[in-house]
Amino acid sequence: MDATAFPYGLRVLVVDDDPTWLKILEKMLRKCSYEVTTCGLARVALDILRERKNKFDIVISDVNMPDMDGFKLLEHIGLEMDLPVIMMSIDGETSRVMKGVQHGACDYLLKPVRMKELRNIWQHVYRKKMHEVKEIEGNDSCDDLQILRNSFEGLDEKSLFMRSDSDTMRKRKDVDKDHADQESSDGNTVKKARVVWSVDLHQKFVNAVNQIGFDKVGPKKILDLMNVPGLTRENVASHLQKYRLYLSRLQKQNEERILGAARQDFSHKGTSENLNLRSSFQEQPSNIANGYPHASQNIQTQANMLDSQLEDTKSTVPLPVPDKKRTLASDAADSQNVTSASSLGGVLSFKSMPVNQDRKPSETMILECQAWTGGIPSKQFMQYPKHNHERCDLLGDYSCLPKPDLEHPVGPSNLYAPPPLISMSCGMEGDARDFSDVKPAIMDCIKSLSPALTCTVDSVSVQLSDSVVTSIDGDLKSSGVDGLPSIKDCCLDQTNSQGSLRPSQEPSIIGSTELASLPEDLPSYPLHGVSLENIGLSSIDLLNYSDAMILSGLQSNWYDDLEFSSEMMDYPSIDECLFASS
């Protein structure tokens, strides 16, 4: 066997309580040219090691022994002799192997032990010796370096008294340089020179990164491309890592800035939209009576439009109203058409009438109402009644009209749109005045419109432009006014050039009705138990009426067979009549 290939004379101590395995291991180790000493007990082996200190290079011990655990023996050897110990056992459980390694075993062998494993145990001895040599050399070099540093510091203290400050700084730099040379010459304490990344050096680095590509960049490629003497791969790798962190931080800051600006714009836009929406909701009419709800949102919208037009009024004519409170009594036949508070005669809803097709729809909404006489413009007025569960005196409190010009003839051809709001108060039997109390100017106006009027009492059929509106039967009676026929059932057919009246029963005189006094020359129509309200500009809806009414020639389109009961309305029942126009 070649002596250079294998270390001869390695001193080995074998400890095992099994004599058979002890003999086998001794023979195998001697074949490897090792010097072998055997022992059957752990305590005996420990005594041998203490007596023959520094006479053994390595110890091989079994884990399971009767007098002492193998791990306990391992601890004693590691503390007292500091020798490499190899543990062996039949049981190869992982927990036991890990326990041996944790206690300081350099290897763990399983029985039966192979020859190859025993032949390589010298490596553990060699590693142990190398560590000892390095520790000794390290301690010696540290002592030498400490001596040099002390001498240099003493030299610096002397130079403080002998030279100026500038010379002292120069000397200190030279000494530091000498220290660096000494440390670099020492192989055990090698200290790398620190690289200062100047502006030019960093610019070369950035140019190399851009040339290679940020996705494909690597320290070796950058180092080769920069070609700077004294620059190592570790320096480039460290600087590349810092450069990547710097770029990621910049990108994060830009993203946060963009998101912050977008969030600010969104919040500003949302605030403005909320303000606009809130202002639109706050534009509700402030003069709506307490507890007087509306039937639909369209009515409330039209009320807002009419309230905005009231600001332009310059002169008003108040209408006197009787002071006495009256209640509207309902007949048994009309009980199904009234609400729980009082009877509601009906509501006629005027919407936009496509009379003048030349005007645009947007102009129609803001167009001032033309007067009934000769197309003279007049102001538009509308107010809402206060609902106090009593009789609403609409004429005296809420209605006012400009004085019309009676010089111009009044007729259906001169009507452009429905008239402004005219509120009329009509009572029932018991406390009333005859129509003869109305001023002659009103009577003349009604007479002039008599060819286009239609009166109904019990059953009414009004037909305008091929549209029929029917009413609910009522038991009230009506009377003519100054030559107008009093009819209980009549029909107006607009297909003929002149209206025709078809009486079906004998006319009867009105019992006890009352009409509130109107201003002079008021171009209005008496209406009993009916409420007309302008809530749109496109159609006319008949809701409900049960008493006699007189309508002038209205130039509009009427919806067919639209009839609603007052119970479907959200309005509380009122005892007056409303004419509304726009």
Swiss-Prot record:
CDD domains per record: REC_typeB_ARR-like (cd17584)
Basic and acidic residues composition-biased segments: 166-182
Modifications made to the protein after synthesis: Two-component system major event consists of a His-to-Asp phosphorelay between a sensor histidine kinase (HK) and a response regulator (RR). In plants, the His-to-Asp phosphorelay involves an additional intermediate named Histidine-containing phosphotransfer protein (HPt). This multistep phosphorelay consists of a His-Asp-His-Asp sequential transfer of a phosphate group between first a His and an Asp of the HK protein, followed by the transfer to a conserved His of the HPt protein and finally the transfer to an Asp in the receiver domain of the RR protein.
Disruption phenotype: Dwarf, narrow leaf, low tillering, late heading and low fertility phenotypes.
Annotated InterPro entries: ARR-like, CheY-like_superfamily, Homeodomain-like_sf, Myb_dom, Myb_dom_plants, Response_reg_B-typ_pln, SANT/Myb, Sig_transdc_resp-reg_receiver
All residue ranges annotated as the Response regulatory domain in the record: 11-126
PROSITE patterns in alphabetical order: HTH_MYB (PS51294), RESPONSE_REGULATORY (PS50110)
CC annotations in GO: nucleus
GO MF entries: DNA binding; DNA-binding transcription factor activity
Pfam families given in the database record: Myb_DNA-binding, Response_reg
Gene Ontology terms describing biological process: cytokinin-activated signaling pathway; phosphorelay signal transduction system
Keywords: Activator, Cytokinin signaling pathway, DNA-binding, Nucleus, Phosphoprotein, Transcription, Transcription regulation, Two-component regulatory system
Modified residues (4-aspartylphosphate): D62
Stretch list, region Disordered: 166-187
SUPFAM superfamilies from the UniProt entry: CheY-like (SSF52172), Homeodomain-like (SSF46689)
Subcellular location: Nucleus
Family stated for the protein in its record: Belongs to the ARR family. Type-B subfamily.
Function: Transcriptional activator that binds specific DNA sequence. Functions as a response regulator involved in His-to-Asp phosphorelay signal transduction system. Phosphorylation of the Asp residue in the receiver domain activates the ability of the protein to promote the transcription of target genes. May directly activate some type-A response regulators in response to cytokinins.
Name recorded for this polypeptide: Two-component response regulator ORR26
Organism of provenance: Oryza sativa subsp. japonica
